[in-house]
Amino acid sequence: MLEFQELTVKEGARLRPYYETCDYRLCEYSLGVKLMWRDYLHPWFTEAAGCLIIRNCIEGQYVFDYPILGPEGDAGAALAAIEQYCGDKELPLVLSVVPEDKASQLVLRYPRVTVISERPWKDYLYHTEDLAQFAGRRYSGQRNHINKFRRDYPDAAFVALTDPNDPRLTAFWADYEAEFHKTGPLAKQELALAQEMFSLLDTGWFCAGGMLAEGRLVAVSLAEKCGGTLVNHIEKALYSHAGAYPAIVQAFAACYGGGCDWINREDDARDKGLRTSKLQYLPAALGGKVRLQVGTELDILKRVPSLKTERLTLTALRPSDRDAYNALCLDDDRNRWWGYDYRTGLGDKPLTEDYFLAAAKADFPARRAVNFAVRLKGKLIGEVVLYRPDFRGGFEQGCRIAPEYAGHGYGTEAFAAAADWALYHLGLQRVVAKCFKENEASRRMLSSCMRPNGEDDTYYYFEKLV
């Protein structure tokens, strides 16, 4: 299973090579955004299948970035690892800020998926040459502002900024705060984070520059090269120096745009003023981002169905099943083959008479699993559980029968009926199962109604396909 660790500045040198070659053209696929907005995104990371996998936690919900490929990266295998992680952890699978050109393949990958694409999420993408030159009639306004700025400040010059302790930067932030008129908490937070990002100049991950006029900085900018895109994280200019803003935009693009076809000036944060400003610079494209909320076939079920076989009935669990179900769940000798120790989930909580039944009955409303009570003449003798989705039309299935009813084929009968229902009524593409190699009875049961699908040191694996 994937194991994540927190994404912090300390991990920047390890992660920057992924972002340096990432050509998704979106600002979220940059180290700077992850660091600058870490208190909102809460990003954690891991590496698998030659890819960087980012798990964000936004407003209490886990969402995953599209995998970022390394030199030998396999996006499909990385997605499969994310799917398995969510299935094992009983988490919803949500892929956020997916590049638009990746969305179509993901829609085909997932049988049940909701796709969301909102205008405010889009990044503003500009041809580097356009911003570096401001050529043609369409940019006459920007050129006029720059010409006025240079007439007012004939000594104005662009300078590279590499020292986080540069006293000119300290003076600029003091001047900027004195003129800062926005009162919203997000704007104030962004300003504080911008200053913090400049403290990372000596890492070599970012490029930065400023416009000098009369010996002091009147505009600054900081960006990051990601593939063929220069992602501009920060642009600030003093309001008192008209024309400083387009001047820094042009000079920065000319200085640092080499090797980059695109400049990403990020989204507009739903701010009308920002949107107006970004549109005035005539973006060549809007970088679309798609959110995919992946569901499962359980989403279409309104209730746990009832199934009938020659001897058995499979139904939802009932309150009257409590004692028999407790006995089934507390049978340690048999449940070692179940692969789950209830004590792990129980933790420090007391074991009550209703614990097992309540836990099982909570699975279906959350669409985590379908728990079937296996009944012989109405009496609960075991259960079949359809659980752990792979989000691609497959579920795992397990079965356990009380010891006093073992040896009569009830497990095989119940398991086969549930698998057939899952494939032909629920509409799954596959049902998989596994058993410990020492569990010969389960191996025989699974072999009778499924086909072998490999083994490892611990398990035999089986599957049944439509």
Regions found by a protein language model. Name each.
Residues 2-14, 137, 157-171, 313-327:
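A short beta-loop-alpha structural element at the N-terminal edge
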Residues 14, 226, 263, 295-336, ...:
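Acyl-donor (CoA/ACP) binding surface of acyl/acetyltransferases
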Residues 28-101, 212-241, 386-392:
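Conserved donor-binding loop and adjoining core beta-sheet/short helix segment
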Residues 74-81, 240-251, 405, 409-418:
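Conserved acetyl-CoA pyrophosphate-binding loop and the N-cap/start of the following alpha-helix
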Residues 89-99, 258-266, 425-434:
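Conserved GNAT acetyl-CoA-binding A-motif
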Residues 102-116, 269-286, 412, 437-453:
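Conserved active-site alpha-helix within GNAT-family acetyltransferase domains
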Residues 111-183:
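Acyltransferase donor/substrate-recognition loop-hinge adjacent to the catalytic core
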Residues 206-293, 407:
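Aromatic (often tryptophan-rich) hydrophobic motifs at membrane interfaces
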